[in-house]
Amino acid sequence: MTNIRKTHPLIKIINHSFIDLPAPSNISAWWNFGSLLGICLIIQILTGLFLAMHYTSDTMTAFSSVTHICRDVNYGWLIRYMHANGASMFFICLFLHVGRGLYYGSYTYFETWNIGVILLFAVMATAFMGYVLPWGQMSFWGATVITNLLSAIPYIGTTLVEWIWGGFSVDKATLTRFFAFHFILPFIITALVMVHLLFLHETGSNNPSGLISDSDKIPFHPYYTIKDILGIILLILVLMILVLFSPDLLGDPDNYTPANPLNTPPHIKPEWYFLFAYAILRSIPNKLGGVLALVLSILILMLFPILHMSKQRSMMFRPLSQCMFWILVADLFTLTWIGGQPVEYPFIIIGQLASILYFMIILLILPTISLFENKLLKW
């Protein structure tokens, strides 16, 4: 009798995805982040579900319901801080996962890559709306500032913003709909993740060398299941250290003050994982230009398959491209730092230079260096 795992219509799909999946024999720890993102998503959905049981999406009670969760609900503080810091872990894994894709040329699987970029947008939207829900000062003003950016769209901008707000300012209607969207989006993300994996399994995984690995494949289980479990243990360890020792390390103290439309905080800034994009937005004096730059800073990822000029897929054997890649990473760290600083000299000019460098490296310098490296191959 054949094993049920290979014949049962449903178990067969799981088997081909996680057990008998042929995987390259040389994929490094950088390939762990896909499974870690899956774990992050599961943690976020579960903790979010339990938080939703006690949260009320009303402007009068939202802030106090979060206080109630932390004070009165059994282990409510743990669930709340796991959810808040879980989002940070999610984005750390996301950035490393995308960085891995850029370094090793995984973007040449362009269906998988483009769905990944859509996933990135969806996760960013979910995180933004989640940040609004506790209804603290930074929640309210962050929502006001970011939704207001849509008013830069010519002709329909103002109408669009008021339509999203459900009134003439961020109020009860906005909070209620943000809660509804924040609840539904993770399930849409889960569906997109399945499509992401579907396209990935059509081609098989890339590997550090960027070469075709069909001649040397190993089964996913037990080799990569055990490797993933190690990654998961480390992820949960880091998350729990963060949650139990310094849960507010990555948060904003202003969010412990209830939302007050009459009092603007001195420095409005988003969570740390949006600061690089926020810095790019602020570095352009024109409102519409800033919004376009903000969207393009993420959307530009979709251009990587077109901008790939090298004869080699991976950067493993391309030292000049490697050097430029790490300069890009340093530039993103600089942008993240600038995004958290006030708008004054010298931060304005540093932000503008870092923003120009970001787009120049991706659109001009990396493709040019790739062409130069192709020439070097002939020497």
UniProtKB/Swiss-Prot annotation:
Cofactor: heme b
Chain residues that bind heme b b562: 83, 182
Ranges annotated as spanning the membrane: 33-53, 77-98, 113-133, 178-198, 226-246, 288-308, 320-340, 347-367
Cofactor binding comment, as recorded: Binds 2 heme b groups non-covalently.
Keyword Ribonucleoprotein appears in the UniProt entry: no
GO molecular function: metal ion binding; ubiquinol-cytochrome-c reductase activity
Binding site for a ubiquinone: 201
Gene3D superfamilies for the chain: Cytochrome Bc1 Complex, Chain C
GO cellular component: mitochondrial inner membrane; respiratory chain complex III
Topology with respect to the bilayer: Multi-pass membrane protein
GO BP annotation list: mitochondrial electron transport, ubiquinol to cytochrome c
Residues that bind heme b b566: 97, 196
Principal location listed in the UniProt entry: mitochondrion
Family the entry assigns: Belongs to the cytochrome b family.
Function comment: Component of the ubiquinol-cytochrome c reductase complex (complex III or cytochrome b-c1 complex) that is part of the mitochondrial respiratory chain. The b-c1 complex mediates electron transfer from ubiquinol to cytochrome c. Contributes to the generation of a proton gradient across the mitochondrial membrane that is then used for ATP synthesis.
Protein name (database record): Cytochrome b
